[in-house]
Amino acid sequence: MRVYHFTEQPYPDAWNDHGGSLRVNLPNRKCEPAVAADLYHRFYDEWLLADELGFDIMLNEHHQTATCMSSTVVVGLSILARETKRARLLVLGYPIGHRPDPLRVAEELSTIDVISRGRLEMGFIKGVPYEFPCSNQNPVGVMDKFWEAHDFIIKAMTSHDGPFNWEGQFFHYRNVNIWPRPWQQPHPPIWSAAGSLGNARMLGERGYVMAVLGSGYKTRPLYDAYREGYMSQGRPAPGPDRFAYLGLMAVAASESEARRRGELVAEYLRSGGIVWPPFRNPPGYLSVEENTGILMGRARERTLTRDGRVVDMRSADIQDLIDAAILFCGTPDQVHAQIAAFIDYTGGLGHLLSMGQAGFLSHQDTVDSMTLFGKEVLPRLKAMD
């Protein structure tokens, strides 16, 4: 079991005056650079602590949003590749679905893999819907573009005998010959995220690490679809190292203090999706089936507890989120028991993506929660392997 400390690096003051949208069109005059600088230093201090405590590290990127100041994940990866000593560095994800230049992606990630001496984990995603307009990209056919970018990046990383040309539907290159090549051969491990059975099966066919983000007790069918796809290629059943799950985390010495921290983290979950309606679902981003489901009132934000109770993540209380395995919250013993029960439900889980900081959770609360987890929970999870 590997546990990755994660924060989206939010700018919490924006929640006090967002005017109905935290993403895309919130004026950047509401971002004070001195405050942002302090926040960046704080988040990197927490990641360095994670490295010392035995966590691995996860980073992501989003654009034009107060919910995530990581507007280019390469900056964070570069800093941590040099400053950390042992942690695996996971990017989940790199939004190659709306990136115009996969050659640059291949160069950047290869360089980071070398600087870190082989500690990079590459997670590729298509990108969230409200970032396509501000990246000047068309969401129609995004998955075709995603897979072509993916194929090009892998070819660029694994071609070592001089330049090659590329003529695709979306990308055209001459004399591709990246320097440096990756440290890990043939390339760093590949991850992606899945939220549908079809995508889960496809990732299983490719054998990539599949991350499921906060789906609670709707996760097992996705893992089972992955297993079917994985074994359809003539392989034995996949091990736990092929499966990852992202959950919120709040640990404290007492249950009451943990729940106070959990409420601060949960409020970020409830409110982080506030965005001006025209940006929420650009034409072509979702499939016909997904849009039909939305029109029929099938909410995408709902999940289930283990006993089948429906939980709406936009309004759920702390106990609902704990029961749905969206939030792991409590004393070290309670959190360990919650995670162990969820692992048992999934049939095996090798990577826990721990969102241990979000929203208004302070630096001191974050450090204390991480330290308790790192010293009292993490060793017990590793012993379960």
Question: Which residues does each PLM region occupy?
Answer:
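Active-site mouth loops of central-metabolism enzymes
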Residues: 26-41, 93-103, 184-194, 249-252, ...
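Short, acidic/polar
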Residues: 38-49, 108, 194-201, 334-342
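Conserved, mostly hydrophobic/aromatic
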Residues: 3, 61, 80, 112, ...
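An alpha-helical appendage that flanks or caps ligand/catalytic pockets
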Residues: 4-31, 143-179, 219-346, 383-385
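Internal, glycine-rich beta/alpha segment that forms the wall or movable "lid"
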Residues: 15-17, 34, 98-206, 219-224, ...
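Hydrophobic faces of well-ordered beta-strands that scaffold small-molecule active sites
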Residues: 3-7, 57-59, 89-92, 120-124, ...
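Glycine-rich, proline-tolerant flexible connector loops at the mouths of alpha/beta enzymes
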Residues: 58-76, 96, 130-133, 214-216, ...
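N-terminal beta1-alpha1-beta2 module of alpha/beta enzyme domains
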Residues: 1-87, 188
